[in-house]
Amino acid sequence: MARVTLVLRYAARSDRGLVRANNEDSVYAGARLLALADGMGGHAAGEVASQLVIAALAHLDDDEPGGDLLAKLDAAVRAGNSAIAAQVEMEPDLEGMGTTLTAILFAGNRLGLVHIGDSRGYLLRDGELTQITKDDTFVQTLVDEGRITPEEAHSHPQRSLIMRALTGHEVEPTLTMREARAGDRYLLCSDGLSDPVSDETILEALQIPEVAESAHRLIELALRGGGPDNVTVVVADVVDYDYGQTQPILAGAVSGDDDQLTLPNTAAGRASAISQRKEIVKRVPPQADTFSRPRWSGRRLAFVVALVTVLMTAGLLIGRAIIRSNYYVADYAGSVSIMRGIQGSLLGMSLHQPYLMGCLSPRNELSQISYGQSGGPLDCHLMKLEDLRPPERAQVRAGLPAGTLDDAIGQLRELAANSLLPPCPAPRATSPPGRPAPPTTSETTEPNVTSSPASPSPTTSAPAPTGTTPAIPTSASPAAPASPPTPWPVTSSPTMAALPPPPPQPGIDCRAAA
């Protein structure tokens, strides 16, 4: 019986979405390697982190990986994490950037899987869809503890709070080995797909036979769901052909291209189209026959101008109402704040403004104060970005998912309850200047024989001579002081005090007390 050769047939797609200004996802799909990274950190930092990690894994896509697949994946992930740390050291402004990672290294009938963060891996086998990764998120811990159901987690306001990611700091990814079978279909996706699209709908799209059409359909579904985030997918089939694909596919931030699908006819799609549209002015040469131009009557022209004015005014009022009813948690001037509006700007004007700021009492109780109050005297400590742990700090810097004011207040309370660094200890008391602390010793000393009354010296017991010459004591001389008496051997055990540990650093392993 001939040996069956298993190969991959794959497709990858990435889209910026309808809300984000740039694409921070990066994806690589090749004959041996499928890898997807969802960057975070705001501005260009997320793009940098995801590109560095994908670049560190790309060399695994060789002709025959063989050997220990998990060891190779682990080494490549650590190299990518070290690259992030080195980049932050060169550019301190990138501190807080990070990325998720879900990757598969394929070798015949087996594959290695590495995962960290909230990007996901799915397996479609025999018509059944199974999630093969576990989200490293705060909401997933609530599900594990039985506090909420998986259905409630799907719409939980804190679903984007990541507990583990590649940020340049030491972290252990999840590594597993799996068996590959002919007919299996694997899906890697960012949370831009799994958040707005249900598993049932994902299953329907994955049942499309062609991998490219299936990937295209998944992106389309995410955009129709509002496209709140970058969305990236890899769809790969395990097939028993003699030859599979060999040309790798790059998409997202790592490709340098802005892959955008035709925007859906939804409110979010139309809003995104308005922000992206660029006017192209074409020069039209003058026509020779100017008399053939239709002439509009003054009444019709006035009607058109009035109609356009009404529509523009209505659009502005509706847009203003939508913006003013939207709230999200983000960094503002170094403080964790609730912002009103949406991220970004239009024609040079900011579309958001600070609304409330978190304030911590000495007993660590959270209250919200208006932005106008933050400039005056306070009986609480403003909740600073540096008070948060690094993963949550990166999330807030990028901006948490928007919603109602109650949603944003809930996010703020969740951060105060679960994401703060421990308070810095009070400074140690020091000795006053000029009074050094005495050394700590333990001694056993025998007295000198000259000081013992039980053994008087013969010279001191003789009577003093009489005469004009004054007696000179044998124990002292005015010209030269007597040397100190020689003691018996002394046993000394000095106790060396241990050096105190280095003090915690605010913003790194502790926060300033309220």
UniProtKB/Swiss-Prot annotation:
Post-translational modification: Phosphorylated on several threonine residues by PknA and PknB.
Keyword Transmembrane helix found: yes
Positions annotated to bind Mn(2+) 1: 38-39
GO molecular function, one term: manganese ion binding
Disruption phenotype: Depletion of PstP compromises mycobacterial growth and causes marginal elongation of cells. Depletion of PstP in M.tuberculosis negatively impacts its survival in mice and decreases the bacillary load even in an established infection.
Cellular compartments annotated: Cell membrane
InterPro entries for the chain: PPM-type-like_dom_sf (IPR036457), PPM-type_phosphatase-like_dom (IPR001932)
Keyword Endoplasmic reticulum among UniProt keywords: no
SS bond list: none
CDD domains membership: PP2Cc (cd00143)
GO biological process per UniProt: regulation of DNA-templated transcription; signal transduction
UniProt: Mn(2+) 3 binding residues: 118, 160, 191
Its biological purpose: Plays an important role in regulating cell division and growth by reversible phosphorylation signaling. May play important roles in regulating cellular metabolism and signaling pathways, which could mediate the growth and development of the cell. Plays a role in establishing and maintaining infection. Dephosphorylates several proteins, including the kinases PknA, PknB, PknD, PknE, PknF, PknH, PknJ and Pyk, the transcriptional regulatory proteins EmbR and EthR, the osmosensory protein OprA and the dimycocerosyl transferase PapA5.
Subunit relationships: 78 interactors between PstP and Mtb proteins were identified using Mtb proteome microarray, including proteins involved in diverse aspects of cellular pathways and biological processes, which contain cellular metabolic process, biosynthetic process, gene expression and transcription regulation processes. Interacts with EthR and may interfere with its DNA binding activity.
Protein name according to UniProt: Serine/threonine protein phosphatase PstP
Species annotation: Mycobacterium tuberculosis (strain ATCC 25618 / H37Rv)
Gene it is expressed from: pstP
